[in-house]
């Protein structure tokens, strides 16, 4: 797609996909319907996570309907669409040593970013400044955020998915930060809360320590074979 390359940059292309990824072969999307038609001829079903791409859903369903008629006539052909999510979830459940190392790197980098933001926080700082500190650290290490960062001061910290991050923090406020990074497709996810002026009030400290105790107890309960 020449136009897309001009606007958005180079495309891997069919040849690049076949060479750069652990797959048997690659084909153009323009040939998708023809390839699916051919593949369905001697298949009993189709594995597809639907509602991710309307165009692909339409092609598969159209081909499936056509081949189902063939099955009624000749006794061969697909009968259903199967959601492979449970199979893929099981495959993703156990990580390889190399995957674990990447996950550790992602977690370490996110932890670094949170620590830096804590040290640079003061009672006149704005939420977006904290966001910039954290995400800037991610980018300086060749990473990127794994989800839109949440930085809420005061009452904003009580909003579960607060993404505006556009208010200034006040003296005495607690700041909640939910931010993680992604390395090679593996994401970290860390939430921490700290006082804007560097010192908890008695009530803040009491609640903070209560939550901290609960978190430590939950971590200690994470053993092989433990139920959720």
Task: Describe the predicted segments one by one.
Residues 1-228:
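Active-site neighborhoods and metal-handling regions in enzymes and metal-associated proteins
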């Amino acid at each position: 797609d020449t136009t897309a390359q001009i606007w958005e940059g180079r495309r891997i292309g069919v040849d690049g996909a076949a060479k750069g990824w652990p797959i048997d072969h690659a084909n153009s999307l323009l040939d998708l319907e023809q390839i699916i038609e051919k593949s369905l001829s001697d298949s009993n079903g189709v594995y597809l996570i639907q509602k991710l791409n309307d165009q692909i859903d339409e092609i598969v369903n159209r081909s499936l309907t056509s081949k189902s008629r063939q099955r009624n006539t000749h006794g061969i052909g697909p009968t259903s669409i199967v959601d492979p999510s449970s199979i893929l979830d099981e495959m993703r459940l156990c990580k390889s040593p190399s995957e674990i190392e990447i996950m550790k790197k992602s977690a370490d980098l996110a932890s670094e970013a949170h620590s830096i933001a804590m040290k640079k926080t003061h009672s006149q700082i704005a939420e977006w400044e904290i966001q910039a500190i954290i995400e800037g650290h991610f980018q300086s290490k060749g990473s990127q955020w794994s989800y839109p960062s949440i930085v809420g001061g005061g009452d904003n910290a009580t909003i579960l998915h607060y993404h505006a991050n556009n208010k200034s923090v006040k003296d005495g406020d607690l700041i909640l930060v939910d931010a993680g990074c992604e390395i090679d497709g593996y994401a970290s996810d860390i939430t921490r809360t700290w006082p804007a002026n560097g010192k908890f009030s008695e009530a803040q400290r009491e609640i903070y320590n209560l939550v901290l105790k609960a978190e430590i107890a939950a971590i200690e309960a994470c053993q092989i074979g433990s139920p959720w």
